[in-house]
């Protein structure tokens, strides 16, 4: 089972800032998604789970769920995606979260056209 490779991550503060400033922002019930073209062949994911979400255990669980959804659904090749989770994300099944991820990504794609 492939993991979450280093090349699939948004890692630098400058990259996050560019995505926040110039990317497309779409709100969903479980998270907010930012999307920006990266010029690469593969998509990259960044997760911004702040202390507002909860303690370390809660934040790590949210990040694990998001990474798993991204790993299973490589739907955005050529884009950097940053997800800011909400508390509601933790009360959702993985299947429902995948559906929400796909829907939010489609909504962001419609906004670029």
Short names for language-model regions:
Residues 1-113:
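Positively charged, solvent-exposed patches that mediate nucleic-acid binding
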